[in-house]
Design a protein with these regions (language model features):
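Glycine-rich phosphate-binding loops of nucleotide-dependent enzymes
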Residues: 2-254
Length: 254
């Protein structure tokens, strides 16, 4: 089985290695991502999936290998470099300021100002309403602190922030963790909307069911190495479980 995608990937991590104190956390791993695609990264704690993706978000630096964005080699040394390549990360903690409303969170650190140099709260709220109308039309709580929002609504704000600032590559860390069924469905619909807009999404996950529901492809890592990549529609939960636990590659993997 081969990669079903053709053309130039949005991003390609090629032969990446990362070591800490002589221990290889990531050992010659390659993975790619195409526009309008969700790729799940799975593996036990310590498998290396988060470490691998953090070299794309700028949190870690690779020791070897290449990062290509739209087919061109890119140097990513910190999160600012990543944002310069339209890469945004949504961490499990969401990094939201609980005491601020949706608009203040969306523009936190990147506030809009008027011609006098003052923060333009009216314009920020209007822009927030516009982007939320696109992503989550049911969102109505614009004037309350995000601490008063549900988990799915908070996730909506974090996603809107990334999309507003022109993310083309989105890294999501267990976006449905600790959410109920209704909230999980809300996030699933958000992800489908982002796919339709041509974004590429890396989903760091532990939950196989979430991967089967949300992802197009799944890459499994074990002990810092890539076990294989599968097209989700071609495999079962048990196939992926075997890759995670045993490092066993099904015939459909590549």
């Amino acid at each position: 089985m081969t990669n079903p995608n053709t053309g130039t990937p949005l991003v390609e991590l090629r032969d990446i290695s990362i070591a800490f104190g002589g221990i290889k956390a990531v050992d010659h791993v390659s993975v790619d991502l195409y526009p309008g695609e969700v790729v799940g990264l799975l593996g036990h704690n310590g498998a290396g999936k988060s470490t691998l993706i953090k070299c794309l978000s700028g949190a870690y630096q690779k020791d070897a290998g290449q990062i290509l964005i739209n087919g061109k080699e890119a140097e990513i040394n910190d999160p600012r470099d990543a944002r310069g390549h339209n890469i945004e990360t949504i961490y499990q903690t969401l990094a939201l300021a609980d005491n601020l409303d949706a608009a203040s969170n969306l523009f936190l650190g990147r506030e809009l100002v008027n011609s006098f140099g003052f923060v333009d709260e009216t314009r920020m709220e209007a822009e927030t309403r516009k982007i939320m109308g696109r992503l989550n039309p049911n969102f109505k709580k614009f004037n309350v602190p995000v601490s008063a929002l549900s988990g799915g609504q908070r996730q909506s704000v974090a996603i809107a922030r990334a999309v507003y600032f022109n993310a083309k590559i989105l890294i999501m860390d267990e976006p449905t963790a600790a959410l109920g069924p209704h909230e999980t469905q809300m996030v699933a619909e958000l992800i489908q909307e982002l796919k339709a807009q041509g974004l590429g999404i890396f989903l760091i996950e532990h939950d196989i069911h979430s991967v089967m529901k949300l992802c197009d492809r799944a890459v499994v890592m074990k002990n810092g190495q890539r076990v294989g990549c599968v097209n989700v529609k071609d495999v079962t939960d048990d196939d992926i479980l075997g890759m995670i636990i045993m490092g066993k590659k099904p015939p459909q993997a590549y």
